[in-house]
Amino acid sequence: MRLNELSPPPGSRRARKRVGRGEGSGYGKTSGRGQKGAKARSGTKAYTTYEGGQMPLQRRLPRLKGEARGRHTPAHPKVYDPVNVGELAAVEGDTIGLDELRAAGLIRKKADTLVKILGDGEIDRPVTVRAHAFSRAAREKIEAAGGRAEVL
């Protein structure tokens, strides 16, 4: 066997499609491009998000918050887990922090949870409450009972 006798196995190599070489080839006249339109022209390519004139998806969806709407709308506003003063009465101990609230099932177990104490309900014992935010009414009720409201 010599190099000039080598050839690929039959059927492993495919001949190049020669378009525009007569009707009998099946790729004559319009060369497999159909009739008119942008796809029939040379050198044109529709961008990937083109939907044929239909309103594109990125224009159908509402605009995002943040920079897209203007600088005054935060893209990711702080989300607090609310806990009412009345719910604090069920928590044992003189100091109530995030761990105690989690153990009582009043806030989510996620570590980055922000907690705000709200003023609904009453508390009748002095406690030190540690949270990320307090409403004015909650702070007044905690301090009226002889406790302290500490912001984390």
From Swiss-Prot:
Region (Disordered): 1-79
Biased composition (Gly residues): 22-35
rRNA-binding is among the record's keywords: yes
Gene Ontology biological-process annotations: translation
Keywords: Ribonucleoprotein, Ribosomal protein, RNA-binding, rRNA-binding
HAMAP family per UniProt: Ribosomal_uL15
Protein name: Large ribosomal subunit protein uL15
